[in-house]
């Protein structure tokens, strides 16, 4: 697991209040981790801050799972 993967999983667990063991690459923020739309907005903001990037609203809507977040951050940093 890369340091980016690990940090994203830590942020997801912290933002959504779930155990890090639940944060698998395949986990959907809403379906598997119990996030609502506000949680996902806050999660995107935390990722933007951590990785010093800006995620457009259009792209943010496409980030639905942990793997989506990893792929996006990896491609944009």
UniProtKB/Swiss-Prot annotation:
4'-phosphopantetheine is transferred from CoA to a specific serine of apo-ACP by AcpS. This modification is essential for activity because fatty acids are bound in thioester linkage to the sulfhydryl of the prosthetic group. GO terms for cellular component: cytosol; membrane. The modification O-(pantetheine 4'-phosphoryl)serine is found at residue 37. GO terms for biological process: lipid A biosynthetic process. One of its GO terms (molecular function) is acyl binding. The keyword Phosphoprotein applies. Pathway: Lipid metabolism; fatty acid biosynthesis. Residues 2-77 form the Carrier domain. It is found in: Cytoplasm. InterPro entries: ACP, ACP-like_sf, PP-bd_ACP, Ppantetheine_attach_site. SUPFAM superfamilies: ACP-like (SSF47336). It comes from the Bacteria. Keywords: Cytoplasm, Fatty acid biosynthesis, Fatty acid metabolism, Lipid biosynthesis, Lipid metabolism, Phosphopantetheine, Phosphoprotein. Belongs to the acyl carrier protein (ACP) family. Carrier of the growing fatty acid chain in fatty acid biosynthesis. This is Acyl carrier protein. The gene is acpP.
């Amino acid at each position: 697991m890369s340091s980016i993967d690990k940090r994203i999983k830590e942020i997801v667990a912290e933002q959504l209040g779930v155990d890090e063991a639940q944060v698998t690459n395949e986990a959907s923020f809403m379906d598997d981790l119990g996030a609502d739309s506000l949680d996902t907005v806050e999660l995107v903001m935390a990722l933007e801050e951590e990785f010093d990037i800006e995620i457009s609203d259009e792209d943010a809507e496409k980030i639905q799972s942990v793997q989506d977040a990893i792929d996006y951050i990896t491609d944009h940093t």
